[in-house]
Amino acid sequence: MYAFFTIFIGGGLGAVSRHYLSVYLMRMTAINAPWAILLINLLGCLGIGFFSAYLSRLTHAQLWQWFLLTGFLGGFTTYSTFTLNLIQLGEIHLASAFLNLFLHLGGGILCCFVGFWLARAV
């Protein structure tokens, strides 16, 4: 039951954080939804890389792993919204859709690697 509630609370907080951060980014900058989701997903990749490496060094980190990795970052990042935004962007401008796809995948892998590297340096 600990896992259920820990993931449930983390996922809810992650989803709400994603929503408000995307609204904030779109209001405070000139970017639209696909690019706001890109930034959020990259931040999430950095976070999941960092926290997975950092928490793996702790002996009693299972609740934190459930809360942060599965829950919060699972709710914060979103593959389904990414794919929907990608298709919508592709209907408007195909080159931008491919750029967005490349930045999500390449940037996500890079950010996850940097997160691992940062955690090992701490």
UniProtKB/Swiss-Prot annotation:
Annotated membrane topology: Multi-pass membrane protein
Transmembrane portions of the chain: 1-21, 35-55, 67-87, 98-118
Pfam families for this protein: CRCB
Catalysed reaction equations from the record: fluoride(in) = fluoride(out)
Binding locations of Na(+): 74, 77
Regulation affecting activity: Na(+) is not transported, but it plays an essential structural role and its presence is essential for fluoride channel function.
GO molecular-function term, one example from the UniProt record: metal ion binding
Keywords in alphabetical order: Cell inner membrane, Cell membrane, Ion channel, Ion transport, Membrane, Metal-binding, Sodium, Transmembrane, Transmembrane helix, Transport
Family listed: Belongs to the fluoride channel Fluc/FEX (TC 1.A.43) family.
UniProt protein name: Fluoride-specific ion channel FluC
The organism of origin for this protein: Dichelobacter nodosus (strain VCS1703A)
